[in-house]
């Protein structure tokens, strides 16, 4: 039992550093999956694109994804930690779309130590989530969506389970290319804890909009996230982004996440600096059946992250 306690303490310390969170479990669910979303600041829920990865951010948006699209994703994170995901989206009648998705986070191998820092061995940790989604066009302008997700986490010989639901709503005015969305992510909780103490899953209430300037290649987006948590200033809820749409097939994107920049500030001899954390960049190529998106950002002061999305319509 003593060995198990120190195992858990060691892991929790590591994972809190990785996730930049201290109040919830399964914080890998907060990481962006879409490279396009990552490039726009990491929290976008309102872009209207034929992009299957949007299933992970707002289920209401998959109505615009091509029928029978398969999607594979990979993200580099901190050293030793990697994450991968996949999705499949299919039309269901004239107004409906369904999809399935999965996420996998591998934290690598970590040291198991005692209270006096004696190494007792090594252990691994990983998180897995599988989900089913459904979106329906409520009218020509409104779409709604729901995702039901099963989550499991393994730490050495210990594991936990949880269930969560995402609810999404989108309003899209095609003639002015204005999109407004609201999402409630991770409504639910643990059904099996590591030990006897149950933890919360990362509930996140978000609202956002995207607007393309008429007769212009520029589209701007703004998203307010974690509106259920007001423990920090209103500005830190905001992420902003802009797309430069060079053609119907090519775009470049950039964004800024104010919360991430604030959380990752560190002090040195020259003062405080976030070392470019908060800034994100990306781009994509969208052909008739093949799509490639790449996004770059920093989610930890010690490492850069690269997200690659590949989608193919069967």
Task: List the model feature ranges, each with a label.
Residues 2-10:
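Sec-dependent signal peptide recognition
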Residues 10-11, 66:
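Short, linear, compositionally biased motifs with a strong N-terminal bias
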Residues 20-314:
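Subset of outer-membrane beta-barrel
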